[in-house]
Design a protein with these regions (language model features):
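Hydrophobic structural segments
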Residues: 1-258
Length: 258
């Protein structure tokens, strides 16, 4: 049997805590201790995911988004941390450190688009490099297809919704920042990118990026980050052959798309 602490130490090798942003809260956030034989890897720890872990006999959940972020002032039965402890399930959460890590969230995302000569930028949280020349609409369609195939399918509607702001330039140098990376468009411009592909960007990010000559693709927070769960699961299977590592089937995008 493998202990929670052993898995936590391995996760720190995969995504060193030193890579995390100062405001972040990664780590072993719920520690029920002991040994586990089965682990569930997910993007978010929701009540549905806790129920799935309990149903499948998983004593540990490894997630990207922290289950505890702001200081807790009270705890009730509706809180996910409470539900974890009630079910005896520990939680390891690796957030911005996994964004920045080698083979982490952004390197997995970059690999989906065949990025070459990959470099880190935006203080390590993004990746930029060369891709085969492609138009922005073509790249957006590829994002929708490739990301949808790597995400849990919703009960209704499409799995991924992609929107883009197109300067009309062919994309040869692509920047990717998973999740809410739209505000970092100027960092992508500084790296000579033709396009920034991210999860979320607001109205003004798109206007300003396009005005400055950068195309912008927003493919969804969930969709740009969930693919890393498979990569993390594979790393844990390699490190602990005796451990059964599952990727959550009940972790879904909270949005429904028309």
């Amino acid at each position: 049997m493998t202990t929670v602490q052993q898995i936590y130490e391995e996760m720190q090798r995969i995504a060193p805590l030193a890579l995390a942003e100062s405001w972040d809260n990664p780590g072993l956030l719920v520690d029920c201790g002991g040994e586990v034989s089965r682990v569930l890897v997910t993007l978010d720890i929701t009540p549905e995911v806790v129920e799935e872990a309990a149903r499948k006999g998983c004593g540990l959940i490894v997630s990207h988004h922290p289950v505890i972020f702001s200081p807790l002032k009270k705890l009730s039965g509706q809180d996910v941390a409470f539900q974890l402890v009630k079910n005896g399930i520990s939680a390891i959460c690796m957030h911005t450190n996994l964004d920045a890590a080698e083979s982490g969230v952004n390197e997995v995302l970059a690999g989906i688009f065949g990025m070459r000569e990959m470099e880190a930028f935006a203080e390590g949280c993004g990746r930029v490099g060369s891709i085969e020349p492609v138009t922005v609409p073509e790249l957006a369609k590829k994002a929708q297809k490739e990301l949808a195939s790597r995400c849990n399918q919703p009960f209704n509607g499409p799995a991924v919704q992609v929107k883009f702001a197109d300067t009309g330039k062919t994309v040869r140098r692509l920047a990717v920042i998973s999740g809410a990376g739209g505000s970092l468009f100027e960092d992508a411009i500084a790296q000579g990118a033709d396009c920034l592909l991210t999860g979320e960007a607001n109205h003004h990010h798109a206007i300003d990026a396009k005005r400055l000559g950068l195309s912008l693709i927003a493919a969804g927070h969930y969709a740009t980050e969930f693919p890393v769960t498979t990569a993390v699961a594979e790393k844990l299977r390699t490190a602990f052959p005796e451990l059964e590592v599952l990727v959550s089937e009940d972790a879904r995008d909270p949005y429904t798309y028309l």
